[in-house]
Amino acid sequence: MTKVSQRGITLIEMVVVVTIISLIVAITLPAVTSGLDSLRLHQAVRDVVSLFDAGLSRAERSQQVVEISVSQHDNALWIDAPDAHFERRMELPEGVSITRVLPEVPNEDESGVRSFFLYPGGSVPRFGIEMRNRRGVLRRVSVDSITGVPRITSPEEQPNG
């Protein structure tokens, strides 16, 4: 009689393989989600810079007053040029929130809307926002009142205000 050999894997081998795969996923998943949170924050910061640039250049090109509004409660920003019939709205992506609107106003209600007016040919007011992602990483986008150029910084890189 010939004995038929069977090939295959045992249940123990399968459990070991599944355990190894689970460990690999458990180790790499936090790094992947952290990377996604960083990408969301980076993109949100670039979008805010673009919005500020659009408002600043719109005021100069159209020679009209442009209003930049920030709603910390709604996690949104928008620019509005009433005389030029121009409006652009931006909501921050999920996982990114506005933590501060600069300059801070004492006893200000966070549910309110802050507005900054850009006058053509005039000096640019100093303003900005601070954003945070789920991991607690902060970025600040502020407009330099001398050059009128938006700057991206980490709050640790500059003094408050």
Positions of PLM-derived features:
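N-terminal single-pass transmembrane signal-anchor helix
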Residues: 1-32
